[in-house]
């Protein structure tokens, strides 16, 4: 695990500039919000997520997270059909603060186009980008 400005940036993930991460697992993509995002939002109290079977589109909103500070759109890092929604996050949204990269994942999708990964950051680029965030 790499730390940049007190933010965890795990290796092996892709990152979007909308503060979401993607982990490729057996041709599927697991999606969640980054440590930076959860720290900016502070105490997350609600997550509105789409349903299994729905399709999300890269760079388009697919849900929201609500904190004591703000309501923020979730922006899809990839296009694909939703295979699984993390109901634990809907029941216990604090998981997004406590464990954003493991228990706090949001969606598991079947990506429509793996080439879209080229338009988001790999780990090395993400580390450099996180250095510019405050």
Region roles according to the model:
Residues 57-73:
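Charged, well-structured alpha/beta interaction segments
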Residues 22-24, 68, 85-88:
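Residue-level recognition of beta-strand microenvironments
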Residues 1-61, 94, 98-114, 119-134:
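Acidic, low-complexity mobile loops and tails
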Residues 73-77, 110:
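Histidine- and aromatic-rich ligand-binding microenvironments
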Residues 76-79, 123:
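ATP/adenylate-binding site constellation spanning eukaryotic-like Ser/Thr protein kinases
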Residues 79, 83-84, 90-97:
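Charged, amphipathic alpha-helical coiled-coil/dimerization segments
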Residues 60, 66, 86-87, 111:
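Conserved "cap/hinge" positions at secondary-structure junctions
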């Amino acid at each position: 695990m790499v730390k940049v400005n007190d933010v965890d940036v795990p290796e092996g993930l892709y990152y979007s500039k909308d503060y979401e991460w993607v982990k490729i697992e057996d041709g599927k993509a697991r999606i969640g919000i980054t440590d930076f995002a959860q720290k900016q939002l502070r105490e997350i109290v609600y997550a509105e997520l789409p349903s299994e079977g729905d399709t999300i589109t890269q760079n388009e909103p697919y849900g929201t997270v609500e904190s004591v500070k703000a309501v923020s759109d979730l922006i899809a890092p990839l296009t694909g059909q939703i295979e699984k929604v993390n109901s634990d996050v809907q029941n216990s949204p604090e998981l997004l603060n406590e464990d954003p990269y493991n228990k706090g994942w949001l969606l598991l999708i079947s990506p429509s186009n793996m080439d879209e990964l080229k338009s988001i950051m790999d780990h090395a680029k993400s580390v450099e980008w996180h250095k510019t965030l405050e």
